[in-house]
């Protein structure tokens, strides 16, 4: 059996506010920042850097929807479902008028503004989030 390839999903930046540009600070006005709590005491909480990592999503076709050759993708936690809609439509070369539905665990359609990271925390299993996509309404 061929091993599934994992690809990094390259989507355009989300509509979130732009990152602030660091400003230049002179040595006289610079004040040292206190160390973060994760750096001071190792606890059960994850460090802040771990929340920025990408998560794996598994995209499965339903019905007569074309199957993607690459099914497993690494996606930023802050990506929205709308970003996935746009990516899948572009990847499958669907016409803008064609509908696309995404379902979590074959049960419900998440809101377009829902972040993938939140869905992963609630419904992810085995280190990945399984999403089903189709061109016609299938569940719920």
UniProtKB/Swiss-Prot annotation:
Cross-referenced Pfam families: APG12 (PF04110)
Keywords: Acetylation, Autophagy, Cytoplasm, Immunity, Innate immunity, Isopeptide bond, Membrane, Ubl conjugation pathway
Record cross-link Glycyl lysine isopeptide (Gly-Lys) (interchain with K-? in acceptor protein), residues: 140
Coiled coil location: none
InterPro entries: Atg12, Ubiquitin-like_domsf
Cellular location(s): Cytoplasm; Preautophagosomal structure membrane
Residue segments, region Disordered: 1-52
GO cellular component assignments: Atg12-Atg5-Atg16 complex; autophagosome membrane; phagophore assembly site membrane
GO molecular function, one term: protein tag activity
Biased composition (Low complexity): 20-42
Domain writeup: Shares weak sequence similarity with ubiquitin family, but contains an 'ubiquitin superfold' and the C-terminal Gly is required for isopeptide linkage.
Complex formation: Forms a conjugate with ATG5. Part of the minor complex composed of 4 sets of ATG12-ATG5 and ATG16L1 (400 kDa); this complex interacts with ATG3 leading to disruption of ATG7 interaction and promotion of ATG8-like proteins lipidation. Forms an 800-kDa complex composed of ATG12-ATG5 and ATG16L2. Interacts with DHX58/RIG-1, IFIH1/MDA5 and MAVS/IPS-1 in monomeric form as well as in ATG12-ATG5 conjugate. The interaction with MAVS is further enhanced upon vesicular stomatitis virus (VSV) infection.
Function: Ubiquitin-like protein involved in autophagy vesicles formation. Conjugation with ATG5 through a ubiquitin-like conjugating system involving also ATG7 as an E1-like activating enzyme and ATG10 as an E2-like conjugating enzyme, is essential for its function. The ATG12-ATG5 conjugate acts as an E3-like enzyme which is required for lipidation of ATG8 family proteins and their association to the vesicle membranes. The ATG12-ATG5 conjugate also negatively regulates the innate antiviral immune response by blocking the type I IFN production pathway through direct association with RARRES3 and MAVS.
UniProt protein name: Ubiquitin-like protein ATG12
Organism expressing this protein natively: Bos taurus
